[in-house]
Structure formats: C-alpha cells, structure tokens
C-alpha cells in the first residue's frame, strides 16, 4: 500500500488538521489564500530557526497533466493550489533548480509564488551547471533564475550536487565563478550560499575544509533514518554528515527524508512494526518526525506532488512531537532490517533520464521495489500460487513499462551511472531485473 492509499484508507483528510496544536517555537501562517479542503485558516508551523518553516517544499515533483500535444506538462493550476495551502500553514521555503522537470520547475514555482509578497517566501535554487560549467554559462544560469522569479535576490543559493573536491574545482573553483558568487553575496543578491552533497566521507571533509575560505551558510544533505547509518556504497552516513555540520554550527537542509518515497512504501513486515506502535500515524510521519528531531535542521524538504502528501506532512509539523529514545531505537531496528531486503536504492530523482535508448530506469526500479514490498516477487517455482503470481507479475510489468522501455533494451553504455547522485550500479541492477523477467518468461526459476 503506497502513501496515498494509506491516507485514504485511514481517513486522514484535510479536516483532521483542525486539531493541530501550537508548539512553543512556531510561526503563524499568513493570510492571502482562502480556506480549502477543510484546512484550518492560518496555522502554526514548527521552526528551528526564526523565519524558516521546518517543512520545506521540494519543487522537483510538481504534479503533471497532459498538454495540448499530449505530452506531460506541469499542472500549474494544481501547483497554485498546493502552494496556497502550504503558504497558509507556514511553509515558506521553496527549493527548485534550473534542471528540474525539464527546466520548467523554476517557471512553475515562480508563477505560484509571485502571487504573494516577496517577503512571504524564501527562494532556494541552484547553480546546476552540469554540462557547461564555463563562467559565462554559470553567470547566465544564475541571472536567469533571478529573472524567472522577478526578484533581486535569492535567499538560499546552492552549488548543485557536489561529490568532492574534483567536482568542485572543475565546475566552480577553476572557472572563477566562486569569486562572482561571493561578490553577489556581499551585495545581498545571494543571502545564503551553500551546496548540496552526494558523495563519500573524504569528499565531504574536503568540501568542509573550504569553510574558512567561503563560509558555507548552510549545507543540504540526504538524511533519513535508513541513511543515518546505512547510506551504502560510495555515500556517507547522515550521522557523520550531520555531526560535522552540527559541530561547525552550520544549518542543515534535509533532502530525501523519505528516501525517494521508499520509507512511505516499505515491506509489509516492516510497516507493521511502525503501525503497531502508532496505528493512526502514516509511515511517512515517522520519517518526517525523525528528520525534524535534530535541532540543527533548518528545513526538511518534501516533494509533495499530491494534496494528501502535503496534508499529512502538515499534520506532522503543525503539532510536532520529536521522537523519544524508544522511537529512535525502533526506527534504527527497522532500518537495519530493511537492509536485508534486496531493494534498489533509487530515490526517483530522474537525474539518469532521459536514457539515450529510451529505457525507463526509475520506472523499472520502482516496479521491482514495489513488488518486493508487496511480497509479489517470487523467488522459486515451488511457492504456493506461483503460476498466478508469475502471470500477474509479467502482465503488470508490461502494463507499467512499455516494451520498448524495458530493461532488456539496455546496451550498458553507462551514461546513467555518471549522472546518478546515489552512485548506483544501474547497469548491474537493470541486468539483474532483466534476467529475473526472462526466468519468469522461460519458467526457469
């Protein structure tokens, strides 16, 4: 059962927010939008830092709809509706990038936010100079962001997805762009300058050694209760990353608190452990309570595509209850057990897309993980109801992933792995899934 199905089954609609209580460190949600879906007017958003809501909006997963030509486009009307409800309840930090959603995320986010006074929202966007990192192109990208948002300043500006000193020097250090960004910060056009990190411990330590030179105002890291101590190959445990930033008194922005949705849609046996402790709470609420329980956290980003996601997260942060020691221990137990499942650690960020050969890489991984979670991944032909499960698996695979976009079309070019911030062995994972599909087709399990 995914997050949307759980929320509908549990009856956790917007009206439930009416009982949200105020906590000591809160900010009142501003007026300007009308009451929608039974949500209470105003609201009280938890804060660790004055003026910044603990729940931040990640703008990489805006809802999509069919355009005039049949292709998917951002559903601007729904984006506006989501932003209205978020703003009404104190969500004021919006994180986007020139790279997100085919370059359209900034435009859609700007259209929604510019209906509000500039002092009501905090803009976080990025220097996503992955393919052309020349000085001129980097400056142009920065100025385009200012122009799109019709603003004279960016509140939080990030060097996008750095894995270590080599990437930093190539894209920023050797081009002269850092001097430009530092001048922009001095002039007030950049209020806070930081970076988002994906990489190993050595790379992180190298970047933090630059703090005395550049003074990082904040750092964005991947942090959730699994990655806290189980970040996996070529990544760094969030416990270490957060610990370094905490000691240096640098505010932390959290990305992937749900690990790409995996912590809201986990194996049934693990979900039951959390539901036994809190039958009325969503699986996602556990992850967001974990992320919000650390005092150095500036904001926790969530890519809330649907209103149910936004409402669920608002329930968590409008009446915030930090995890106690027993709950922390329970989550670490769940995390340890989760590591025994052969899930692909894909977060669905789509950085690997488009594949030059048309393969739906995130879709294939999602299908595989969803079936593992649901217990419909058969490992041997002796399992009860094997024939029925096998047939259903193959039919559902063809329905979820068009034949021309399936794993057997991978030619092992490796371009996807170069772009993957999780450092996944994508080719190996696709080959493994393709071999499994073939074994089902040939009935050779």
PLM regions and their residue ranges:
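Structural motif corresponding to the early beta-alpha repeats
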Residues: 100, 116-135, 139, 160-161
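N-terminal binding-site loop/beta-alpha segment at the start of enzyme catalytic domains
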Residues: 2-121, 165, 180, 186
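Conserved beta-strand positions
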Residues: 57, 96, 125, 156-159, ...
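Short catalytic-loop micro-motif centered on adjacent basic/acidic residues
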Residues: 93-100, 191-196, 299-301, 420
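Conserved, mostly hydrophobic/aromatic
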Residues: 57, 94, 109, 123, ...
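Structured C-terminal cap/extension of enzyme domains
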Residues: 215, 240-445
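Glycine/proline-rich, positively charged
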Residues: 65-66, 132-253, 258, 265, ...
